[in-house]
C-alpha cells in the first residue's frame, strides 16, 4: 500500500476542464496542496502556458514566476503548481493585467479580465461560523480563509466581500430568495440566476430553485450555490455569456447568425 502524499497526476486523470490534450505527454502538473481542491483548481502553469500562451513550456513558466511577477489574491506565488480556484484574482505586474477565475457555462475556467479596482477584492462563501478559543467568533470561507470577529449577522452560505490588501470583511450578502447566484458545481456549473426558493431535505441534500435572465428555471444542490449580489447588481463583473446556458439548437442558430447564413 502506498504511503505518503501522491506526487504525480496522469494526464488522463487530470480534470477535464483543464483542456489538456491526451497525446502530448504521460503526466499532467499535479496541483500543490492549497486553498482549493485538486479537481476545482487550476494550477498557475496551466493558466499561464495553456490559457494565456505567455510561455511555451514549464521552464518558461518557472522563469516568469521566479521574477515574482505573478500574484494570486495580492500575494506573490512562485510555485508553478499553485492551485488557483474560483473567485481568485491573478495579477500579472509585468503586463498590468488582472484576471478573476470564474466558470463559463461549459464548466471551464474562463479567462476573465478585470479592472484594477475590481482586483482589490474578492468574494468568499461562508462555510463555517464558530467560536474559537476564549470565545472569539470566526468564519471560514470556501478558499480556506479564517476571519476573526466577523459581523454577528453573517451565517453559513452567506457571501462575504474580502479586501485583499487587509484580509478584512468589508461587506456581506445574505443568502435569500431574489439574490443573484453563481452555480459552482454539478451539471449546471457556470450558470447565473436568481434564487426562487430553497427546499429543505432532512437527511438529504437541500435543493435551490434558480431562474436565469431568460426565465429558464433549474435546480441544484445548496452547496453548489454561491451568492454574488442582488438581482441585476452583481458585486463582480460577469464573464462573456453572462452565465446563460443555451440549448444546442440555440447555440447553432446563434453561430449561423454570426456567420451571416
Swiss-Prot record:
GO terms for molecular function: RNA binding; rRNA binding; structural constituent of ribosome. Residues 42-105 form the S4 RNA-binding domain. Pfam families: 40S_S4_C, KOW, Ribosomal_S4e, RS4NT, S4. This is Small ribosomal subunit protein eS4A. It comes from Saccharomyces cerevisiae (strain ATCC 204508 / S288c). The modification Phosphoserine is found at residues 32, 247. Keywords: Cytoplasm, Isopeptide bond, Phosphoprotein, Ribonucleoprotein, Ribosomal protein, RNA-binding, rRNA-binding, Ubl conjugation. Component of the ribosome, a large ribonucleoprotein complex responsible for the synthesis of proteins in the cell. The small ribosomal subunit (SSU) binds messenger RNAs (mRNAs) and translates the encoded message by selecting cognate aminoacyl-transfer RNA (tRNA) molecules. The large subunit (LSU) contains the ribosomal catalytic site termed the peptidyl transferase center (PTC), which catalyzes the formation of peptide bonds, thereby polymerizing the amino acids delivered by tRNAs into a polypeptide chain. It comes from the Eukaryota. SUPFAM superfamilies: Alpha-L RNA-binding motif (SSF55174). PROSITE patterns: RIBOSOMAL_S4E, S4. SMART domains: S4 (SM00363). Its main location: cytoplasm. Belongs to the eukaryotic ribosomal protein eS4 family. Component of the small ribosomal subunit (SSU). Mature yeast ribosomes consist of a small (40S) and a large (60S) subunit. The 40S small subunit contains 1 molecule of ribosomal RNA (18S rRNA) and 33 different proteins (encoded by 57 genes). The large 60S subunit contains 3 rRNA molecules (25S, 5.8S and 5S rRNA) and 46 different proteins (encoded by 81 genes). There is a cross-link at residues 62, 134, 161, 168, 174, 179, 211, 233 (Glycyl lysine isopeptide (Lys-Gly) (interchain with G-Cter in ubiquitin)). Transmembrane segments: none annotated. The modification Phosphothreonine is found at residue 115. InterPro entries: KOW, Rib_uL2_dom2, Ribosomal_eS4, Ribosomal_eS4_C, Ribosomal_eS4_central_region, Ribosomal_eS4_central_sf, Ribosomal_eS4_KOW, Ribosomal_eS4_N. It is found in: Cytoplasm. One of its GO terms (cellular component) is cytosol. Present with 573 molecules/cell in log phase SD medium. There are 2 genes for eS4 in yeast. GO terms for biological process: cytoplasmic translation; translation. Disulfide bonds: none annotated.
Amino acid at each position: 500500500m502506498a504511503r505518503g502524499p501522491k506526487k504525480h497526476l496522469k494526464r488522463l486523470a487530470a480534470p477535464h476542464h483543464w483542456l489538456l490534450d491526451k497525446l502530448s505527454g504521460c503526466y499532467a502538473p499535479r496541483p500543490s496542496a492549497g486553498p482549493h481542491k485538486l479537481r476545482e483548481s487550476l494550477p498557475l502553469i496551466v493558466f499561464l502556458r495553456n490559457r494565456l500562451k505567455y510561455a511555451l513550456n514549464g521552464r518558461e513558466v518557472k522563469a516568469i514566476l521566479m521574477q515574482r511577477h505573478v500574484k494570486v489574491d495580492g500575494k506573490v506565488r512562485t510555485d508553478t503548481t499553485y492551485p488557483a480556484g474560483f473567485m481568485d484574482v491573478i495579477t500579472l505586474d509585468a503586463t498590468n493585467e488582472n484576471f478573476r477565475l470564474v466558470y463559463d457555462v461549459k464548466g471551464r475556467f474562463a479567462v476573465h479580465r478585470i479592472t484594477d479596482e475590481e482586483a482589490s477584492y474578492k468574494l468568499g462563501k461562508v462555510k463555517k461560523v464558530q467560536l474559537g478559543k476564549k470565545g472569539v467568533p470566526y468564519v471560514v470561507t470556501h478558499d480556506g480563509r479564517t476571519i476573526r470577529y466577523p459581523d454577528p449577522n453573517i451565517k453559513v452560505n452567506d457571501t462575504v466581500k474580502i479586501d485583499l490588501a487587509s484580509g478584512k470583511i468589508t461587506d456581506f450578502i445574505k443568502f435569500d430568495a431574489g439574490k443573484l447566484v453563481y452555480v459552482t458545481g454539478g451539471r449546471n456549473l457556470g450558470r447565473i440566476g436568481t434564487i426562487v426558493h430553497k427546499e429543505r431535505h432532512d437527511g438529504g441534500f437541500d435543493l435551490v430553485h434558480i431562474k436565469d435572465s431568460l426565465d429558464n428555471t433549474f435546480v441544484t444542490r445548496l452547496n453548489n450555490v454561491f451568492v454574488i449580489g442582488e438581482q441585476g447588481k452583481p458585486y463582480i463583473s460577469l464573464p462573456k455569456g453572462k452565465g446563460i446556458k443555451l440549448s444546442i439548437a440555440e447555440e447553432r442558430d446563434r453561430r449561423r447568425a454570426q456567420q451571416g447564413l
